[in-house]
Amino acid sequence: MRKYLLSALLLVCSIAFLSAQSREGLTEYKLENGLTVLLWEDHDAPDVTGYVVVRAGAVDEPAEYTGLAHYLEHMLFKGTQRIGALDWEKEKPIYDSIIALYDQYSDATDPKIREQLATQINECSMREAKISSTEDFFNMLDLIGAEGVNAFTSYDLTAYHNSFPAAEMYRWLTIFSDRLINPVFRTFQAELENVFEEYNMYANNPSSQAQKQLMEDIYKGSPYERDVIGLPEHLKNPRLSRLIEFYNTWYVPNNMALIIVGDFDSESTKPMIAETFGRLQPKELPSRPSYPSVQLTGKKHYNLGYNPQVAWVYPGLKEGDADQDVLEFVCNLLYNGQTGLLDQVNTKGDVSASYAFLDARRNDGRLIVMAVPYYDANQQMFESDKATEAIVMKEIDKIKRGEISDDLIANVKHMYAQQYKAFNETPSTKMNVLVDAFTYGKPVDDIFTANEKIQSLTKEEIARVAKKYFNADHMTISFDEDTKNMKPKTLPKPNIKPLDPVKNAKTEYAEAFQKLPKGELKQTFNDFNDVKISSLGENVTLHYTPNNKNDIFTLTLRYGVGEHEMPLLPYAAMLMENAGIMGNPALEGKDFDQQIAQLGAAVSYGCNDSYFYISISGEDENMNKIMNLVNRQLLMPYLEQKQLDALKGNEFFSRYSRQKRTAVQKSALMQYALYGKKSAYLDEVKFIDIWNMDGVQVQRLIASARTYALDVFYCGTLPEDKLVPELPLTEGMQPSKSPFLQDRVTYDKPTVLFLPNSNVQQADLYFYINGRPYDIASDVQSDAFNQYMSGGFTGIVLNEIRVKRSMAYSAYGVNTTPELPGKDCYFIGYVGTQSDKVNDAISVYMDILTDMPKDSTQLVALKAALKQAAQTAKPSMRSKAATYEYWQRLGYNDDPSKVNAAAIDALTFNDIEKFYEDNIKGKPVTIILMGDPKKIDVKAIEKELGCKVTKLSPAKLFNSTQELMDAVM
């Protein structure tokens, strides 16, 4: 006991030291206009990430106009009275007319009048497109080398973000503040179509539909009950004036934050922020309404074509509540992916899966426990909801009664401490906690004291909070495996003409922006010598990366054999995830997990076509004890029959039901198109072989895999001479043939493969072209082509498909390179669109492939993007070794960004054209399509492409289910 208390005291002291260390580089202040500014320097980051966060989301919308927050997120990329304006004086009357027409459209009920108004809006939009440039904002961001330009909307916030080089700080601050001054919501009608496509995309997903139904029930009477994207009846009846009103109400500096994380200097940045964001005008915010919380009682059941799942939902709490940290800790006692009470149930195989989490929001919250029932392959049925509930409630009752072991509490506290130690490793983690703190009004200091509070939690306090929330009434909601999907509403294709904007139009804003001052781009390169490579014997290589941040190690053992040579190995790896250790008595899997967790460690297994992986993490001081346990598990894995049965049942159900699941059908269609009879769904291990697996076979498979060439990737603080004796090395390792790359089907003429599916709400349309053998000498040209084709909204594909024609929410086209030089590259394009737009989408995409639109004015911005991408290709400390090994396998003996720098500087638009002509132009195109046959004109496709459409059935893409029945009989 004294030893435990001493360890706990040392842990708290080390956390207090880390708190001061973790704060380093963080600055928090407010501008005079009320804008919150959070700056966090991280000089290990490859670039800078900037966020503008608005404390407003779907929850702040009027009930009669849902979807406004998300609409606004889309529209705030369209420019202002300066950005994107070619002639604002001429444009303004047209813009005002569009606003007025939408008011009339929203009020009208006669379909004919609405159609006439929609036509008028379309005509005005086309006129406006001739005197404006919605690409202006994206062009400027491309010019400064911005990457990941995007935004997202949730219930409680909206955020706009991207990364950029520190040298472009002033120009980034300028355009990100300018976008908030007098915004103009151009092409509103066209962008609505893109939102419709996004809505249809979610309607296509049974998982999204299950979540939608769950939220409707557990947040009844609150804005949280509806999707962020909005209700379909409101999406079809927009009012632009209400969007402007929403913007004017909530997008004010005293309701916003500017958050910057990365490699920059805060002191030199502050004056720039004051000059740019200080221009925004504050405004008094309206009071937010409160909503009564629904009584959570009773049971509900739905058929959604979704895997059987049961949810038990309890009243939770709001973000920032005094109990929040403790209740989240309680959830981790139930489920943390390793040692929680529900984790132990999962490990034993009593259920297919179970987990618990706290869904805390600004105005309300829920405590949610979910489970997927055990599937019995012999009975060919899932265990009943009642039986599943009994298993889960047994564990919840332990929490309610305060029957929580000291070891479990200590393990979860240790997990928190480790997460806190690793907190400073990634800039994205820093950004996420700052966004969360601002959104919910939490003191930033809480970030650094939360873990200290967790370490000081008493068992009595944990029990008090657990009883308080889990003793409340709860609602039970279940979904079953009925694959007769509920068909949600979809939004129809409108009759509007595509926009035809002025090409290469340059605004006054763009000309002025290019003249703004910028710093000197700092060039830093990866040094392969950061990773020490040593031979530990024949076919055994150590890749050693020192950890200079903390005492947490990561160790990956990669054996050179995978599913291709050992088809049952992935299943053995899955079983090892829950294995214990043979003995007298045997150590069960749940007890193995507990012992590993007590050492502050985690172990996982994985397998792909080429490799078998063992991944281990923990504290270096415990390396010997951790590896002792892992070695024993590897040599003598112990599996209970229920664990074997659970894996077999899950695989049986997966194979039995997959022909009816649209997401799996799409995957199988692509596999068939690319690999033919070698598709992963056809060339798969027979189920009878899985059915006959036992613990002895698992032991043999793991032992056999460990005889292949081994790469050891270590990041930690132990010196090599202390590390090597702990590794599970064996002699006589055989050479590896990995990585394995399956040869793809070669198409020598135009081909269309069509999988008809009347249940899909959105069609999936792919374009495939066989390529040439890969050589790193063509990397710059390939990257330039990909940037030109799919570099965000200025890329040819998205611009033609989405921006101009509103055919799809998602569209791209890229040249894909393999993992090995000499293997063939290939082009893959994609459009996700409504089935009634498929014919038009094929025509537009084929025009792009047949005669790629030429726009040499993009070259400057394109090269800036390539340089920035090269500069930010900096692997994290823990991924350096694997990344460098991959680059060397491709043929690089130095950092690719250094090797390719001169080629990027010398790049011309002719190089992009030549790459297109050599690899795309005139090559046979294979179209791969899944959609509703009632809405797709197959004859028109055949006429346009000059080839027959090959219709496929699910039976062609999957093996027969008869072998499943034969195995279990």
Feature map (PLM): residue ranges:
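Positively charged n-region of N-terminal signal peptides that target proteins for export
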Residues: 1-4
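Bacterial N-terminal signal peptides
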Residues: 7-16
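Proteolytic maturation boundary segments
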Residues: 20-39, 265-303, 309, 315, ...
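M16 family metallopeptidases and their MPP-like homologs
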Residues: 40, 45-61, 67-69, 85-178, ...
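A common structural junction motif
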Residues: 178-185, 277-284, 393-404, 631-639, ...
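Hydrophobic, small-residue-rich alpha-helical packing segments that form membrane-like cores
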Residues: 187-192, 209, 223-234, 240, ...
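A conserved hydrophobic secondary-structure block that centers on an alpha-helix together
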Residues: 237-249, 582
